[in-house]
Amino acid sequence: MSNQTERKIEMWRMTIALVLAAAAFVIAGCGGGSGNTDVAPPPEDADAPATGTLKFFAYGDTIVDPMLDPFRKQNPDLELKTASFDSNKAAAAKLAGGFEADVVEVCTDEMSPLTARGLLRPLDGKAVPAFHDLAFSGAPEVRDADGNVLFVPASAGPQGLIVNSDQLDPDTITSYADLFDPAYVGEVALEATPLTAIGAGALAMGLDDPMNLSDEEVEQVKEYLLDHRDQFRAFAESDASMVNLFKSGEVQLADGGRGTTQTMIEDGVPVQWIAPKEGSLSWVCGLAITSKAQNIDAAYKLINYYASPQAQAISGDMGFVAMNPKALPLVSPAFRKTADPRNLKNAIPETEPENADAYDRAWQEVQAG
C-alpha cells in the first residue's frame, strides 16, 4: 500500500504555513468563490469517449500509470494532464491561486479548505451509476448541506491492529485498549498522526465518537496518552518506519492498516491484521469536480472509471480496499483478502474535527513528552 501515513503527517505539518498562504491569497484578491458551485450537468452521451483536455489533481499514488492507462486507452482522443499534491490544504491553496484542474482528489479528514472556499462543484449522483455500490457512499461527509454529492468515494484504508503472530497470540488482541496493556510495555508502536493517535486513544478509553471529541475530551485523551507514553517503543512517522520496527523485532503490536500489514507479510514478517471491536478508523478519499472545471463531460468520465469494477480491481491489486464490491472477483487472489470492502464494515471514517487544532496541540504535547 502507498504511504497514507505520510500524507496525513504532511497535512498537519503544513497547516500553519498554508493558513498564512491562504490569508495572502485573500488579501491579493486571489481567493476562491468565483467558480460555479451549481450541480455539474451530466454528459448528454455518457457512453461517448471523452475528448479535449482533462486536468486531474490528486495524491501521487492515485495518478499512477497502472490505474490511468486503461482510461487513456478508452479515451484515445483525450489529453490527460496530471499533477500531484501532498494535502488538501496545499491543493486548496493552489486552486485558489489560479491553478487549473477539472477533477481533484478529496479526503474526509482534510477537505474543509476546499469546501470553505467554494472550490468544489457538486455532482449529479445519477450520472455516476455505480455510486450507490461504493463503500462510504452513504457517509454524510460525501454530501453538502443541501444533500448534493460532493465527491465519489474512490479509496479507503481501515486502520486496525497489527500483531506479530509468532510472539503474541492474535486471539488475545481484540481492542485498541490492548495497545495500552502493560504486558506489552516497550513493544508497541503508534502511528504518529494527530487524528489516528488521538482517535485510537479515545477508543481505548471508551469514547465512541473519536472524530468529534470536545476540547475537554481531547485533553483527557492527551493525559491518557502521556500517562502511557512509556508503553510505546516508537511513534511511527511512516508506513516504512512501522514495517522496519516489526522487521527488527523492536515492536510486536501496533495500530496500522491492512496494506502495511500486507507489506510486512511480503517481507517475511509473521504478522496478522485485526479489526478492533470498537471499529476500525479509516481514511476515505474520492474524486470531485472543481468549481472552475472546463471539461465537465471528461470529468464525469474519469470519475465513473474510478468507480468501476475494473479500476477498483486495479486499486485492490495496489493494496487498497476495492470500494466497489463487484471488483472483488477481478482482484488477484493474493490481494483479495485485503481488497474486500467488507473490511470496512463498522469502520469509523476519519473526518476533520471542528476543533482540529486541539487534536494537533494535544498530539504535539504527547510527542514532546
Language model region names:
Residues 281, 285, 290-347:
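Mature extracytoplasmic/periplasmic domains
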Residues 31-34:
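Bacterial signal peptide processing site
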Residues 26-29:
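C-terminal motif of bacterial Sec signal peptides marking the signal peptidase cleavage site
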Residues 41-113, 243:
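Early extracytoplasmic/lumenal segment of secretory-pathway proteins
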Residues 58-65, 100-101, 105-247:
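Extracytoplasmic ligand-binding site segments that recognize negatively charged/polar headgroups
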Residues 110-115, 247, 252-270, 319:
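A ligand-binding cleft/hinge motif common to bilobed small-molecule-binding domains
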Residues 219-228, 265-291:
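Periplasmic-binding protein-like
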Residues 332-369:
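Extracellular/periplasmic bilobal clamshell ligand-binding domains
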